[in-house]
Amino acid sequence: MGVSLLASSSAFVTKPLLTQLVHLSPISLNFTVRRFKPFTCLSRYYTTNPYNMTSNFKTFNLDFLKPDLDERSYRFIELPNKLKALLIQDPKADKAAASLDVNIGAFEDPKNLPGLAHFCEHLLFMGSEKFPDENEYSSYLSKHGGSSNAYTASQNTNYFFEVNHQHLFGALDRFSGFFSCPLFNKDSTDKEINAVNSENKKNLQNDIWRIYQLDKSLTNTKHPYHKFSTGNIETLGTLPKENGLNVRDELLKFHKNFYSANLMKLCILGREDLDTLSDWTYDLFKDVANNGREVPLYAEPIMQPEHLQKIIQVRPVKDLKKLEISFTVPDMEEHWESKPPRILSHLIGHEGSGSLLAHLKKLGWANELSAGGHTVSKGNAFFAVDIDLTDNGLTHYRDVIVLIFQYIEMLKNSLPQKWIFNELQDISNATFKFKQAGSPSSTVSSLAKCLEKDYIPVSRILAMGLLTKYEPDLLTQYTDALVPENSRVTLISRSLETDSAEKWYGTAYKVVDYPADLIKNMKSPGLNPALTLPRPNEFVSTNFKVDKIDGIKPLDEPVLLLSDDVSKLWYKKDDRFWQPRGYIYLSFKLPHTHASIINSMLSTLYTQLANDALKDVQYDAACADLRISFNKTNQGLAITASGFNEKLIILLTRFLQGVNSFEPKKDRFEILKDKTIRHLKNLLYEVPYSQMSNYYNAIINERSWSTAEKLQVFEKLTFEQLINFIPTIYEGVYFETLIHGNIKHEEALEVDSLIKSLIPNNIHNLQVSNNRLRSYLLPKGKTFRYETALKDSQNVNSCIQHVTQLDVYSEDLSALSGLFAQLIHEPCFDTLRTKEQLGYVVFSSSLNNHGTANIRILIQSEHTTPYLEWRINNFYETFGQVLRDMPEEDFEKHKEALCNSLLQKFKNMAEESARYTAAIYLGDYNFTHRQKKAKLVANITKQQMIDFYENYIMSENASKLILHLKSQVENKELNENELDTAKYPTGQLIEDVGAFKSTLFVAPVRQPMKDFEISAPPKLNNSSESE
């Protein structure tokens, strides 16, 4: 649950203006020279009869435009109360899902109750007249392998869930009560104010939220964009009471007035046939009230002349150096078929030769750039460019602004050009035609929201990303709006002068006018010969041939094509999705890269510099729906490549050759070193719960180091050290490769040969292949405590992670811990977050490290960490009786939920490939571990689980590691009088992590589950049954 940073329903932008500006993924943006045949059904929106009227609801006769391999069936209906629903039958779905989008959001908050829409979203989870228990909905989903969430945006509120497919109706039954008969119980209302307040406090030191709110605050007060929308205890508790307002009454009024059926769009995905889904929709949602409320419009301009031609100087929490320039532009939302913002985003956000970013990097002024269009409300649209500056770039920020206008000037002189549109169109066609299925909950959530765009025919709702109209005049109109008079700049750095503080987050800032000389240069920037349009893309695919064989059963694991002293080659021809795609994973086992913290940091710099040098290749590939990356791992280095298979191996070859011939440059070394130092420093200012994994890994794993330790080393690295280190990287190399997809095995063998030809020496080290990371074993019956104060002295939240180390990893123990995590998941959240209101972030899970099995609970809270530890221990103690009293039927439901989740079929080729990659990386080659684990879970008895609880969780022999990240802010308002300070915190304090680790044994690495023999790939035929 939460407030979304989305300020509009724009399909092009996923972050707020002036925070994380969007240059859309090049998959959907870029272009190709060769043309596809046009889709024959693009113009078929309705059949002759637009709809059929049954006795209960209206069914529209639509011819949906779908990706080629989409086997789902779709139906669009309207209930008598005007609620509209898109129903999706997926006969193969393991998870069903549903989402309801209300076309009302935070813009409708009353002036005297900021955050009410968000608060209403929270309260709808707390029970309905039909299901009054406040955790009934979440409990039902948990028992049946489900999950849920919601968000409140400016003009819409979106609720969604997914659940094992057999239990869709029960979940829908509970879900529908949100909208027809919510309770808004007083007790729940009072408690949930604390949850909203905790959510707000979680974001108080988050620069994205701080700068977003500052941007809003410095706009026209007559437009609701100006408002604070999250809410807190002051706006929803203290002030309403002082003003004689009953917040529960206001919630009821808000829900009655705005949660009107005619403003709701529902999307349901399940295995059931469309008639059944239609009947369920009618039965469960027909009672949602319709008061005929119209979708509100917000006609006031967000930016008036007094808000433009300004520089907003912002002092961030983190060490950021950014320049963001935004323009008011024509609203192009309804021109979704030609998408002028997308074309401009592609051009200004390009990273290849001749681009704005390439030139800024050459000057040493920038590291990253993004650009994107953004509609906040009808008639209020923006286009923005966001640049991550270097120190030198910050000094030359005015020159950077002029360069932006020089690039815009070049575009005004060069556009429109039909070939750019053609290439973008062809890439969007290919991406749509071969679109892979995503998660059910994200699918329905996105579609429910998109249905609010009533200017898009419902039959095209699946194909909104396509470019189908060439409208050069609109592109010219859009580009012509990028002028100084329509712009304002946000400059972000700790070094800037400020004179004001924003009301809600306290962000320090100062607003100054554009200097006269800057305006002059912005208006007459001239042309810069270094700035040009991107070249035609050599990586665009034109051959999408797939030799599909019907009626075969997919293999469960790849075959081992080759194994010798230097490498293993795993291969699997796609036999499941029949997509023209491929996935390549190349893992170099390189002991020298992690022999010390210095070597580890030098390896990080090496990969960063190599990626930087090969950015031109990477970016052109990304524009053509191919991806390639080069990263450091805790075993060495890894290259991953994916995308349309026609040119995937060509890309890999080019990239490998580039890495092989790469020679670092000192100027880029200094810039990337500085960028990494800033990144490491900023990690120490992240929200506490996101820092926890780094501290935990640094304590429990071999050759792992804390952020502070990495920072200390990184600051002292020299260019000479890197130059001397690079020749040693590939000594004793061993590598493993996975090639998966629409790729021939002969091509896979060629990849192995190519890599071997590039290896600089033939020193064989047979131990390298087993040099995997291992975790330390805690002594039995011992509890250890690690404490550290947060670097951010203003963050009010602390965080605790309570880890029980069960034992050395085994399949049996993994099954037991997995089921235990399933059993405690909902009660833990309900107890510690909902009932005790400890904090917004409460999380529990099983945790399998490098050789050990564990259970953890994590809480981020304003409470002290000793208090949180007490409440965690209390939860564990009381859960024993809950487990013993649990009806056998409920216990079996939890087993079924976990087994169904483990046995989910792959949704797409990327998911399948990731499963194989993980097994290769872990070294156990247990490609079917989820199936094996499901069998083990199915055989666990309730008594075995009670024994597990008593012997592992509550036993005196339990081994525990408890991490305390402590806020420096003392909260005197919290009541912790019941805490036994003589007892908590528990455990032996770890004062020196290195000394502590030196006393411990390490766990064994996972061993191969079976012997694999080298074999040729099996010939695919249709003699076996399909999956």
UniProtKB/Swiss-Prot annotation:
> What role does this protein play?
Involved in the N-terminal endoproteolytic cleavage of the P2 precursor of the a-factor mating pheromone. Capable of proteolysing the established mammalian insulin-degrading enzymes (IDEs) substrates amyloid-beta peptide and insulin B-chain.
Tell me the protein's name. A-factor-processing enzyme
Copy out the induction comment. Answer: Expressed in both haploid and diploid yeast cells.
**Major place of residence:** membrane
Q: Name one GO cellular component term.
A: mitochondrion
Activity regulation info: Inhibited by chelating agents like EDTA, TPEN and 1,1-phenanthroline, as well as NEM, free cysteine and DTT.
Family annotation (InterPro entries): Metalloenz_LuxS/M16 (IPR011249), Pept_M16_N (IPR011765), Pept_M16_Zn_BS (IPR001431), Peptidase_M16 (IPR050626), Peptidase_M16_C (IPR007863), Peptidase_M16_M (IPR032632), PqqF-like_C_4 (IPR054734)
Gene (name only) = STE23
- What does the similarity note say? Belongs to the peptidase M16 family.
**Gene3D superfamilies, per the entry:** Metalloenzyme, LuxS/M16 peptidase-like
What Gene Ontology molecular-function terms does this entry list? Answer: metal ion binding; metalloendopeptidase activity
